[in-house]
Amino acid sequence: LTLGEFGTLYDCACTNVKVYVSRIMKLPTNLDSDGMNTQFFIFTLKDLRNAIAHNNVIFDTRFKTGKTDQRLVTLLEREVGISNIDFKYMDAYIIMITYFLRKMGETKNACKQFISSYQQQTEFLRNDLPISIYNQILGTQHKSNMLALQNFISKS
């Protein structure tokens, strides 16, 4: 069963099942009343997973096959405390993955290590590229996004 097939299977589930999954994951009901954010997460993650599986190294977000649902973006912005999350930059995927890892019970320490590893790689990139190109790849909010994400982990 591929992640895309799993997403399609989840899409076919009735609303009660989707709401039940959201409740298990402790997603806020005011931002996920119909349980659709888990589905949006699955399909957003699918593109990243496929890019990694087929291309190995991910440099930017050209792997996206569709638009990320605004409800998922709103959920992440409000829950994590980061404004203007944009899935044209890798930070958005790191934010989304970290958020859902915490919701699924991953430890704070493991999430901090995940972010630290990502930051280390982006620092290598920053040292090797002119700042204008670096900002085109990661956006100008990278540092503030990562600080806010670390703050979210500490509080969650």
Residue ranges and their predicted role:
Residues 1-155:
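Long, contiguous internal "core" modules enriched in hydrophobic/ aromatic residues
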